[in-house]
Amino acid sequence: QKFFSEGQVGDAQMRWIRTQAVVEATEKLDGIMVYGVLSNGVMQFWTRSGYTDAAVNVNRWAVGQGSLGANFFGLLEAVEERGSTATFEWIGRQSTIKVKEKEIKLVLLQIRDKVSGRYWNRQEVLETAEHYRVPCVRRFPSYEGKSYHEVHCAVKASKEHTEGVVLRLGSGQMIKVKTTWWLGKVQHK
């Protein structure tokens, strides 16, 4: 699924998107996207570029979390058995993209069926995350059911100190909308 940032979508497409209903709204985190891959019979975290140095660090860190009760690899295996892929954001000082995070976290973003491309519903994702004691991305239910344009305006007016939101539209398209706070913080770095 292709994610678009505002400004990446052409004017004609933007006019069409503006009235689309927001199906799901979640927090946009500042980190490195990783996902589960079954490699030689072993579940691993990979980045979009493959089994990189960052992926090695994520895997090491996730193994260490087992002693604290989180079972990241159990979640990956359960999702794989259902023919799906879990996507996470790796955040913290070791993966700073724009803003320094104090705490290292691996946050479940979504789970998607590999064949149909269907995203699991929010309740399934939350129950899976809870079962394996894995943190799940924050949702903004107050934005759901509204048009993209309404949500875009609300996010821009928000005083929330967050990067922004990821919106899944009724068409299945995903769009990232950045907060004014975030854009100001990035410009002043």
Identify the function of each model-found stretch.
Residues 1-189:
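Core nucleotide-handling region used for phosphoryl-transfer chemistry
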